[in-house]
UniProtKB/Swiss-Prot annotation:
SUPFAM superfamilies, per database record: Nucleic acid-binding proteins, Translation proteins SH3-like domain
Organism: Wigglesworthia glossinidia brevipalpis
Chief subcellular location: cytoplasm
HAMAP family hit by this protein: EF_P
Keyword Protein biosynthesis attributed: yes
Family in the record: Belongs to the elongation factor P family.
InterPro entries the record matches: Elong-fact-P_C (IPR015365), NA-bd_OB-fold (IPR012340), Rib_uL2_dom2 (IPR014722), Transl_elong_fac_P/YeiP (IPR020599), Transl_elong_KOW-like (IPR013185), Transl_elong_P/YeiP_cen (IPR001059), Transl_elongation_fac_P (IPR011768), Translation_prot_SH3-like_sf (IPR008991)
Name of the protein described by the UniProt record: Elongation factor P
In-chain residues carrying the UniProt-annotated modification N6-(3,6-diaminohexanoyl)-5-hydroxylysine: K35
Pfam entry (one): Elong-fact-P_C
Length: 189
């Protein structure tokens, strides 16, 4: 069953189909010019690619509701190309490829609780917690050409990510990382 909304009815947080791709409405601004028809200027985020753009719709134009589902999951383990997850509600297991996870692949650890967005029963997006605690596997290496010594150094995490951290961080310690910025936040004791 297809559900339609007029551009006037759309609110931020509503998920719609645009050019056969699920999108999230971030902002909806109604504009009534002095001359001409009123319209809606809608800020939209594509759920698959993550691109954000603004599109103008006539006020009476119909938008198609996107049947997407956000599911709480827990990461289990990774193999060469995939991360394996389990749905918390029914314990069904599924995989997401490293390619589909993109940069978020670097911040996933075992037993991490996150939210996966499904469309047509396929995972299209993953929302990680803002902060993740990850073990440092190597804190004793330098990047060639980095001759300026400051209060920071590069460290390698068990996930394979390389980040800057203070010089007092040692191997085998656990650090808190901001998954949105990809930066060191603090040391966990």
């Amino acid at each position: 069953m297809i559900i339609y909304y007029s551009a006037n009815q759309s609110k931020s947080g509503l998920k719609i189909l645009l050019k056969n791709e699920p999108c999230l409405i971030l902002e909806n601004q109604f504009v009534k010019p002095g001359k001409g028809q009123p319209f809606n200027r809608i800020k939209i985020k594509k759920l698959i690619s993550g691109k954000i753009f603004t599109k103008i719709f006539k006020s009476n134009e119909k938008l198609i509701y996107a049947d997407v589902l956000d599911v709480k999951v827990k990461s289990l383990y990774k193999d060469k190309k995939y991360w394996n997850f389990i749905k918390k509600e029914n314990f069904e297991q599924f995989k997401i490829s490293k390619k589909n996870l993109g940069e978020k692949y670097k911040w996933i650890i075992e037993q991490l609780e996150c939210i996966v967005t499904f469309w047509d029963e396929n995972p299209i997006n993953i929302t990680l917690p803002r902060f993740v605690d990850i073990k440092v596997c190597n804190a004793n290496f330098d990047i060639k050409g980095d001759t300026i010594k400051s209060g920071n150094k590069y460290i390698i995490l068990t996930t394979g990510a390389i980040i800057k951290a203070p010089i007092f961080i040692r191997s085998e310690e656990i650090v808190r990382v901001d998954t949105n910025l990809g930066e060191y936040v603090s040391r966990i004791k």
